[in-house]
Amino acid sequence: MEEHRLGGGGGGGGGGGRPPIPGAAGRKLPGLSRHASFVRSPANSTKSGTEKTFENMDAVAYMPVVRSGGWADIGSRHTMEDVFICSDNLMKEFGVESFEDGPSAFYGVFDGHGGKHAADFVCSNLARFIVEDEDFPREIEKALSSAFLQTDAAFADACSVNSSLASGTTALAALVVGRSLLVANAGDCRAVLCCRGKAIEMSRDHKPSCNREKVRIEASGGYVYDGYLNGQLNVARAIGDWHMEGMKACDGLGPLSAEPEVMIRNLTEEDEFLIIGCDGIWDVFRSQNAVDFARRKLQEHNDPVTCCKELVDEAIKRKSGDNLSVVVICFNSRPPPVLTTPRPRVQRSISAEGLRELQSFLDSLAD
C-alpha cells in the first residue's frame, strides 16, 4: 500500500511523513527553482470568490470539522504508480500561521504513468508550491492553479538533471479552507461530494475524446486518435511527460496541459464527505454508487480509513484493472445521518359524474 500523510489524524494504513524527492541516481537534485506565475492576474482589482468568502466567514455559523483517511492497492498491475496525500492541518505542517478560523487541509491523489517518479514528485511538492505562492492565501484559487504549473515546470527541471525520472502523472488536489472547498484537477482522477446522500461531481474527467479537450488539443497542434492524445496518452491533462515529443511546450500551450480545472463550493451542514480517487476506482464505480457505498460504511463504523479500504477492496472484487487509490474526507465528527423519505401524499379526486353516481348509491341505501 502506498500512502503519504503530512500530519493530522485519521490516516491510512502504513507509512508517514513527507515522501522524499525522487533521487537522481546518486546525484542530489538542485533546489527547486520557482518560475514566474503562469496564471495571469485580472486587469481589475475585483476580489476573488474565496477572498469574499473569508471576509464574510464570521457571519456564518457553520464550520466543517475535517477528518480523513486514505488507502491504496497495486490491484492487478505488476507495478504501483499511484500515491496519495492527506494533511488535515496544512498550515501547521508548513509552519504558517493560520489566517482564518476553521480547517486548513490539503488532500491529493496522483496516478502515475510511465513510472512513479512524477507522482512522487508532485505528492512531495505541490502543497509547498501552493503555500509559498505569492497569491496565497489572498487568492487561493489563483495560487492553486499556479502551483500545478509551477510543479510541472520544476519536474521538467528535475528531469533535465536526470532523464531516468521521465514519467507523468494525473493530479487531483482538494483544499478545505474554512468552509470553502476547492478542487483542482488535471487528468482523469475524480472528486465526488456527498450532499445529504446525493453525489455532486467536483471535477471533470479530462479525456482526449471529450469535445472540449479535443478542441483545445487540436488548437494546440495535437490530435486525437482512437481516444488517445497524439495516439499515445489516454488523458488530455497531466503533470510531467516532458520526454514525449510534441506533447508539451515551454509556454504551457502544448496539447498536453498541466493547467487544472478548479471548482469551488461553500460547504454547508448538508455536505457530509468528499471522495477523491484515481480512475481505477471510477472504472467500476459510478459517482452516485460510490457515495451510496461509502455512506453505508461510514454509518456502520464512522472511520474514513476503513471506508477507503472497503472502497478499494470492492473495486478489486468488481475487477478493476488498474492501481487503486482513494481518499475520503469527512466534514463532521458524526456519521452520516439516516435519511427518512416522507410518504408521498396521494391526492385523490372524483369527477362530477362519479360524485353523482356515489350520491345516487347513497340515496338508494337510504331508501
From Swiss-Prot:
* Pfam families reported for this sequence: PP2C
Give start-end positions of Gly residues composition bias: 7-18
Coiled-coil regions in this chain?
none
Q: Which cofactor does it need?
A: Mg(2+); Mn(2+)
What are the BP-aspect GO terms?
A: regulation of defense response to virus; signal transduction
The Gene Ontology terms for molecular function here are: metal ion binding; protein serine/threonine phosphatase activity
Q: For the region Disordered, what residue ranges are annotated?
A: 1-29
Task: Note how many cofactor molecules are bound and how.
Answer: Binds 2 magnesium or manganese ions per subunit.
Q: Which UniProt keywords apply?
A: Hydrolase, Magnesium, Manganese, Metal-binding, Protein phosphatase
* Database matches in Gene3D superfamilies: PPM-type phosphatase domain
Swiss-Prot/TrEMBL catalytic activity = O-phospho-L-seryl-[protein] + H2O = L-seryl-[protein] + phosphate; O-phospho-L-threonyl-[protein] + H2O = L-threonyl-[protein] + phosphate
Q: Which residues form the PPM-type phosphatase domain?
A: 67-331
Q: Where does Mn(2+) 1 bind?
A: D111, G112
List of residues binding Mn(2+) 2: D111, D279, D322
GO CC terms of this entry: cytosol; nucleus
Q: Give the UniProt family note.
A: Belongs to the PP2C family.
Protein name, as recorded: Probable protein phosphatase 2C 57
